[in-house]
A protein has these predicted regions:
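Helix-start/capping segments and mature chain N-termini
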Residues: 1-86, 107, 114-306, 310, ...
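Charged, gly/pro-rich active-site loop segments
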Residues: 76, 86-97
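Short helix-terminating capping/connector loops at secondary-structure junctions
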Residues: 95-99, 138-140
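Extended, Lys/Arg-enriched charged tracts that mediate electrostatic binding to polyanionic substrates
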Residues: 97-105, 109
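Positively charged, low-complexity/disordered segments
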Residues: 311-313, 318-325
């Protein structure tokens, strides 16, 4: 945990046991939502080491988010050192390979008191961790999604392209409504035209049609996911045509297969999408071949199971060890 006053440099961080924070009721993060977070995982690799996957990308995304929200960016080296030190101090909580991961939550917030709507006078950066079980128990399984015409995640010119804490609470009710109707999550459409797919809850969307992979382009309303960019690079290296473009919901519902990606699931197959009175099922309810290939190969890269892939270092995506047994 480290602090920084507005206009100063970040001070040295210190390691401490997990505990409650002391914040003023006037803290900027409490009153105005001036804060952001990142989501990462430390995993047990095939060789027994504990590895992180492209953590420098999280550090850079956090810097961009901090600038957008008027907070002092955390230097990349400081961010990475904080993450690695926290993981090292919690190695006993990293599950065996394939049994889960140590989830890592870097958090940057305006902790200083400010009554007016303005940047906080002081900021706090911290990293905490928690062990989590495998996202898919028994293997990757297709999920069902519902397209929302009522709710939108973000609008042009807003903060949809950064991992701001205020982006997530508004999605809780739509998600709860979808689950009540038997669906796993919501597909959000764009707020301007109400017809282009943006995100799936807190995940990035992809669809495959006649061997061509499409994903919504980054226009400031969609989070630039680390898994998203990794899937794009990996798919292109395997010879697939990948387009970052506007993806109409009708095009996606006519696709051969669809999937979404994120830190938690890596790649999640979409088995069914409902929009209005239309319901489409993909691949007979099974995982599509392209989806499965990308899931297996990216997971292999993340866990250093290199027997399943070729030339991972050329992609610049190989995980690196923070601690070797």
């Amino acid at each position: 945990i480290a602090t920084c006053k507005q206009g100063d440099d970040w001070g040295l961080g210190k390691m401490q046991d997990f505990q409650n924070l002391s914040l003023s009721p006037a803290a900027g993060v409490i009153n105005y939502g001036q804060g952001l977070f990142e989501g990462m995982k430390a995993q047990r690799a095939a060789d027994g080491s504990v590895v992180l996957f492209r953590p420098e990308h999280n550090a850079r995304r956090a810097q961009q988010g901090a600038k957008r929200l008027g907070m002092p960016p955390v230097p990349e080296e400081m961010f990475l050192d904080a993450v690695k030190q926290t993981v090292r101090e919690n190695l006993r909580w990293v599950p065996p390979m394939g049994k889960g991961a140590l989830y890592i939550r870097p958090l940057l917030m305006g902790g200083g008191p400010i009554l007016g709507v303005a940047p906080a006078p002081e900021y706090t950066f911290l990293v905490f961790v928690s062990p989590v079980g495998p996202y898919f128990k028994g293997g990757i399984t297709p999920t069902s999604l519902r397209v929302s015409d009522e709710f939108h995640r973000a609008a042009p010119g807003g903060s949809g392209g950064v991992k701001a804490i205020g982006n997530y609470a508004p999605g809780m009710i739509p998600s709860k409504m979808a689950k009540k109707e038997g669906y796993s999550e919501i597909i959000y459409l764009d707020a301007a035209n109400h017809k282009y797919i943006e995100e799936v809850g807190a995940a990035n969307f992809f669809c495959v049609k006649e061997g061509r992979i499409s994903t919504p382009e980054l226009t400031g309303t969609i989070l630039p996911g680390i898994t998203r960019s990794s899937i794009i690079e990996l798919a292109r290296s395997r010879g697939y045509e990948v387009k970052e473009e506007k993806v109409e919901v009708g095009y996606a519902m006519d696709a051969d297969e669809c999937f979404c990606v994120g830190t938690a699931a890596v790649v999640s197959s979409i088995g069914k999408i409902q929009h209005g009175d239309k319901v489409v099922e993909y691949c007979g309810g099974e995982v599509g071949s392209v989806t499965m290939q990308l899931y297996e190969e990216l997971t292999a890269i993340q866990q250093l199971s290199l027997i399943h892939i070729s030339e991972p270092t050329r992609l610049g995506m190989i995980s690196y060890a923070v601690f070797c047994l």
